């Protein structure tokens, strides 16, 4: 079986492992170099993960009915949480908007799971490791084909230092440029 869900909005697509890892995503176009390419290059490919502190006991994915919104539920030693991933596409002012934006909503379901948010994009097919610039509520990844920005209400220091945080409320992450 293929352990990935697929989301996209006709500008880009992302393959999301049932463990929450975005292991394949070309950005900003389908024919661009991947920014997350762990699916093909485990060592240099880069990924965007929302892993629990301990081991994953159970995981499953499903789409919200009649949508391209992917829900991944993770059960771990400390509890259970859900990651909802989607790429917005909407109609407004008599035109279609297809922003280069990936949204991740992380909800605690049971217990007090600790998770690590790890965003490791790459450029030029795994050859470029971008520089990180930390601002008040976002991290910019510089040196890629297009500047990449991760905006979140998670404490940025936990992301930069690859530390676990207790998920006791719903959190959001937006990946944009």
Each language-model region and where it sits:
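Beta-sandwich/jelly-roll carbohydrate-recognition scaffolds of carbohydrate-active enzymes
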Residues: 2-18, 22-177
């Amino acid at each position: 079986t293929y352990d990935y869900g697929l989301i996209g909005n006709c500008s880009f697509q992302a393959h999301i492992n049932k463990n929450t890892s975005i292991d394949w995503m070309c950005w900003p176009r389908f024919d661009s170099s991947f920014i997350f390419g762990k699916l093909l290059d485990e060592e240099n490919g880069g990924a965007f993960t929302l892993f629990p502190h301990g081991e994953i006991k159970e995981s499953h994915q499903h789409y919200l009915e009649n949508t391209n919104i992917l829900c991944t539920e993770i059960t771990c030693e400390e509890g259970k949480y859900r990651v909802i991933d989607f790429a917005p596409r909407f109609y407004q002012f008599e035109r279609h908007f297809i922003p280069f934006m990936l949204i991740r909503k992380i909800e605690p379901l049971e217990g007090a799971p600790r998770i690590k948010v790890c965003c490791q994009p790459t450029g030029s097919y795994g050859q470029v490791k971008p520089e990180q610039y930390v601002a008040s509520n976002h991290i910019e990844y510089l040196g890629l084909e297009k500047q990449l920005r991760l905006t979140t209400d998670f404490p940025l220091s936990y992301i930069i230092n690859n530390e676990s945080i207790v998920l006791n409320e719903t959190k959001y992450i937006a990946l944009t440029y």
